[in-house]
């Protein structure tokens, strides 16, 4: 982005995740970057700035429903870090302003259908202005993308590559994440935007390599065909990891993001796979301890069956954290994530790796 008054402005800074992101940025990088904070509530914003030792002049009150005010704030910085969700409700004005003004943008959304729509609407504008719009930069889907990329690099050209991930996690959900989940259940998603390759089709590679033109179309690498790995969406005991397992709750997000990244890398010539499959499961306990498996199965079935009903969402909202709330600091510090990933190609080559992070996966490890 062009020379601006700030390098980074954190939008949604007074939310649960926003506060943590702002604190980390200011503590670690304020000597190297000019950092500002933006949020809707002036009093809470000034209180946060005081806690972090940030001058009041570096704080900006902004309501994302006010498009003109959003443009003013976006125009002050080279990069917007948005933690203000649900993004389907509050995010479009920010993305639109960044795309138009050439301001780089990143967020921690897991709303695939929303980002697909945003890419369709604003990718061309972002390419023209020089803005880079980068989503899914939290727990969904940074660990998955890192692991898949590291494993895929070990393989040469293959007819097929299958990668399967197993998550062991300990952590809590904050109110913003739950609000996003409830909003997603309420909307039911947008059926035309939930295909496994939706982010590939929507992106058209604008943010990575520019549009495919008539001049280079004949030499463009063929993108991998998506296949369903054996054992995807499995409920039961998995011999490979000797654990009970269910589908991972964020697999619907991560699989689509991973396929987009895989396709982009293949477009750039990094990989050469004709078919590619990716799936995610939760790792929930040894054979003699099925309790967490049973509880997780019941939870997933309950959300699937009752989630579309307004009365259930209203009831559920009484028992979960509200936006701005989240796990205690002690709980966050005690959290962890371990990701075991297995890859197998059609030629018989097998590879695996393990990623591990200390701290709550959503509220420390990836913030």
Each predicted region: which residue ranges?
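Conserved beta-strand positions in the Rossmann-like core of class I SAM-dependent methyltransferases
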Residues: 33-36
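Glycine-/Pro-rich loop/turn segments that contact NAD(P) or position catalytic residues
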Residues: 86-209, 217
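Conserved Rossmann-fold cofactor-binding substructure of NAD(P)-dependent oxidoreductases
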Residues: 60-79, 83-89
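Structural motif
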Residues: 7, 78-79, 104
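N-terminal Rossmann NAD(P)H-binding glycine-rich loop of SDR-like oxidoreductase domains
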Residues: 6-29
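N-terminal Rossmann-fold cofactor-binding loop
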Residues: 38-42, 63-64
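Short, conserved SAM-binding/catalytic segment
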Residues: 48-55
